Amino acid sequence: MRPLEEVDIEVSAPAALTAPSLDTLRALGARIDATPAGVSPAAPSGPARFAATGRRLGEVTAYTAWADVLPDADAADEATVQAATGMMHVHGRRDGAPRGLAVDYAATCASVLSVQGLLAGLLGRARGVSGAVELGTGADRAALLTLSQYLAAANAPEAEAVPSAPGGPPFTSSCGTAFELEALEPGPWARFWRALGAPEDAIRVGWRPFQFRYATACAPLPEPLHATARAVSWARVRQAAASSGAEVCAVYPLTGHPAARSGGPWTVTPRDEPVSAPIDHATPPAALPLAGLTVLEAGRRVQAPLAAHLLGLLGADVLRIEPPGGDPLRGMPPCCTDVSARWLALNRGKRALEIDIKSPAGQSELRELAAGASVFLHNWAPGKAERFGLDAERLASVNPGLVYAYTSGWADRPLPDAPMGTDFMVQARTGVGEAARPVDEPPAPSLMTLLDVLGGLLGAGAVLAGLLLRERAGRGVRVESSLLGAAELLTAPAVHRAAGGRAQRRPAGFRRPLPTADGWLAPSDAASRTAAAVFPTLRDLPTDQAVAALRARGLSATAVTTDLAALPADPRVGAALTRDTHGSLVVPSPWRFL
């Protein structure tokens, strides 16, 4: 049995907000009608609609709009959503000016969130939530969620640990090979550069901006490091990595990545044996769908913590397992009342318990906790769960009804020359660096953590699919999602364009904002050519006047957010942003239950 077996789903336009999830819904067993009567599948505006009806599950409908918290005029499509929410600013930090992502990142995340809402609604119905369920989300809500760590840091009272300035990988060897470098500790970083003959001062100064690039989306590295790379061959770069403990990965083209696996961006595998005891109690009527369920999270960095955070927003009780002394990222600057603003963006509202999972006593304690949990979620390095005796089979022996969730880098599909499964390395290996930039920009992974965040969303979706299957089939379930699945979902439109004989990459200047007298504006994709043609007569105007002039011509456009610290005062979106008890900025939930 599959989670959505015997579930019919009507899907209506716009395609940009629905297409990313159709294959996933089919892989989960749903019967899809993507062209309901009277609905144009190519309609450019929303909201999109996913209406699910299942035997003994009732009806659940998810609506997805471009603008759910932003005014319609400021969130007309992918380009304007990226501009208004600050996504263009964050992606452009490496280059020193706002740049639009050439992939439909906000729309893809919104579509994934819509599927999560459907799964959560159906799960709630199966668990006893009364009445029909309707929920709404938006590409703007999705964008704010993906930017939540950057927004929290920008609006904290402390400064960043390193200055924000243009720069960053990839590096380029003497033969022209662009490559990403990964070193999670200063030792491998220093040994790598010393093996290539880099100056000691540059090695020392470069470590901190390189280390913090995941947090800041930029890395102003000393020029001598780039010069060192340009002076040596790719073969020597690889030798230096092998001898130092660092890892390198060439920036691959999209054509260098094998075909995506069919079946969606995750796997959902039920156990063979049915569970004899009741799985869990029904929720009180009108409660959130996951109320009464416990999620045990042993996550680090972004992917698993974000997945658990989303499950918490849907009502689950999340218990986070931290090492003795607590998660060191709790103190990562900038802080709000001594707690990292970035950490709060992913872990707000979770309970925490310190356990030494490397010790037999800690492993035994964690197994005892798993015996009473509904979900166990982790993103440990490959093989670690087995070494600790905390793999799916071992935990199933203490809790046969457990949903065991692994959010990984490469899933079970190691690619040739695949490096460690971190965000920028997966971007480099899978062609995301090429897809994310138009044809007049050199391929380069975005320093915005595109895959960690989308991978976290997919992890939450996989857990919801597993919980629904467990509820319907009465069996424990193992689910796995990955950064690789996130990369393939994000690059699928480019791959499909190439299969149809069209250009994989977007044209020169695609989603590049237009400069005004005091800032930048972004036209919608549909209005971009006309806006560029008339813009020479408007570029000396202030941004608000230039936007108004374009709108007077019937062209959609909005101002580009270039300062995340100013967003709470921005009348377009400020009312949707709040503060927690620490004073840290909080973005709105990605869902509204109607």
What are these regions (language model features)?
Residues A373:
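An anion/phosphate-binding loop that grips the pyrophosphate of nucleotide cofactors and donors
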